[in-house]
């Protein structure tokens, strides 16, 4: 297992490259109760030249770590109803991820009500106090949320949840306006969400982002097949 990189070192590594999100949830075709599928996707991503992996769950991350030294952005998806945030939503999930020695922990930093009752700035501060050497990424949906996380000391701001909160911009593709605005504000942006084509990734890279995460367009074959099938119907 490689040593955790500094923010500067990681930014060098991610610059101009693609981070591939390798995830499958129960009910999806590539989900397996016994595991073993996500490391195959990660291996394919590495062979293609990916600069990092985003992965969900302790099991999947451990399996991916066994086959690659690429930096991992780790999350744990767990529902806490009736609250909506479910991506690394409490300190419990942060603790589990911190024990894995991964490069970055990503967590929901939207303004929605949280299970722990904290506001985002307080949650970020608590995590930073507990794990001062851990790089952190805020999954947000709006410019204001990104700015709050940035000002609270988060290392990276991901546009992951734009279009997935009721109050954020609803678009079929990536939220280019949000990505550009955060970059112009001096935020280290990891663009993520609805990036469907190499052309979109190139446009995003030209905005000066710190990194780009592509998931469904690479690692969700059902979604990819549906896009082709729908195109023939239109």
UniProtKB/Swiss-Prot annotation:
It catalyses: an N-acyl-D-glucosamine 6-phosphate = an N-acyl-D-mannosamine 6-phosphate. Pfam families: NanE (PF04131). Transmembrane segments: none annotated. CDD domains: NanE. Keywords: Carbohydrate metabolism, Isomerase. GO terms for biological process: carbohydrate metabolic process; N-acetylmannosamine catabolic process; N-acetylneuraminate catabolic process. It is an enzyme of class 5 (isomerase). One of its GO terms (molecular function) is N-acylglucosamine-6-phosphate 2-epimerase activity. Pathway: Amino-sugar metabolism; N-acetylneuraminate degradation; D-fructose 6-phosphate from N-acetylneuraminate: step 3/5. InterPro entries: Aldolase_TIM, NanE, RibuloseP-bd_barrel. The keyword Cytoplasm does not apply. GO terms for cellular component: cytosol. Belongs to the NanE family. NCBIfam families: PRK01130.1 (NF002231). Converts N-acetylmannosamine-6-phosphate (ManNAc-6-P) to N-acetylglucosamine-6-phosphate (GlcNAc-6-P). This is Putative N-acetylmannosamine-6-phosphate 2-epimerase. The lineage of its organism: Bacteria, Bacillati, Bacillota, Bacilli, Lactobacillales.
